[in-house]
Amino acid sequence: MSERLDDLNDRREAALHAGSERAVKRQHDKGKMLARERIDYFLDDGSFHELDMLVRHRAHESGIEERPYTDGVITGWGTVDGRKVFVFSQDFTVFGGALGEVFAEKLHKVMDLATSVGAPMIGLNDGAGARIQEGVVSLDGYGGIFWRNVQASGVIPQISVILGPCAGGAVYSPAMTDFIFMVREKSHMFITGPDVVRTVTGEEVTLEELGGAGSHATKSGVASFVCDDERQVLDEVKVLLSYLPSNNLESAPVVAPQDDANRSCPELNDLMPDSPNLPYDMRTVIEVVLDNGEFLEYHDSWAQNIVCGYGRLNGRSVGVVGNQPMRFAGVLDMMASEKAARFVRTCDAFNIPLITFVDVPGFLPGVDQEHGGIIRHGAKLLYAYCEATVPRIQVITRKAYGGAYVVMDSKSVGSDLSLAWPSAELAVMGPQGAVEILHRRELEQSADPAARREELVDEYMEKFANPYVAAERGYVDDVIDPADTRIRLIAGLEMLATKHEELPRRKHGNVPL
């Protein structure tokens, strides 16, 4: 037995150092951690249990003579803050982290386990794509991964962390997960690289411009979160996990409250500008209301006219959506609608209550928006709210105009509780536009159109642009003192804690994609 144990230990040692010294040095010289170093940093100390440590490729006819253990990816399970998670970490020092048949089988196994056990699946991506030498077998492996991403969708949280290159077909697995994290100047995602783009289209573009973290954080909306280095990004994943349940049958962890549930927020009374046309920062409202001012913002650099993210109220996770008057007056456009729709559906999938702060003057007008599909994109957000069965509370802080008001989780689309500040303006449209339509002839015949227009705007504001007409009809459940917003939200969530709602039986809804 002693000899057999020695042999086992030798094999394990070889697996622990599967990459060559040269490849390891090259990885470190780039300022990047090794696959095992990432797992060790991310998981609780001593909690990692590895799967398939001793597997090797069997592509004997592919011309690959080396057969290192692990085959370029580390898989297994462990804990983060005491909670079970499954993880894979691509090893760029072995075959460049490229995916072959055995590599894919390892991912299939760990993904199946995560889904059946009901624990989050975390993918640490740093690889060169498909292993060309293994041909179509690699493509079949990717297909199995994509299929499993879809089977796990809405069942367990799936988080992709891009720590190096992720190109070609390899990008589609992260794209189907719930969240994508990237590192500035280290992470790159694209279907076709700069050389192919140059050859096919003649466009000159750098790697960073085409598929860097900055581009995906600000332009494409692919990156949910972006950090400065690997350790920071892994720490941020841990923070996100703290807001999420392990699966769709559980609730998110409850944290012992460190903030008074009965805390008043008097600063909110002084936040709103006197002029309805002046902006204020919706993030301030959100952070003042949440426990300890802690707010993990989702897509903070993309579609900034709407704010989405996670926080807690009295120790319980909530998803927060809010129009941002600081950007384009908080209008809804194509990107904002898509961003918020994705966020709302993710919260609903994982039993996280939704708080929606409304200050929306409407949908962004323009030929580009219409031709780009604002009708279809706006419908995504409307669909997401109508479909959501989690507790939903709406808070109208100022403007709530037209169809955009309805879309932003109004009572008519199923919000459980609608609260309004005294500054709220619920109307079909803004006063200027309404006056132009309702009184066009009168203004044309007026001796002083400007003065008469101002009078009519004031009349409209007094009669319609307030929360009380809606409150009289029950479209708003209560008009509240802004200072009481936190107190009222916590009370509302406690009341809704036992809410149970089921959608009609169907194969699946037809989201306007």
Question: What residue ranges belong to the model's regions?
Answer:
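Ligand-binding clefts of soluble mixed alpha/beta catalytic domains
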Residues: M1-L513
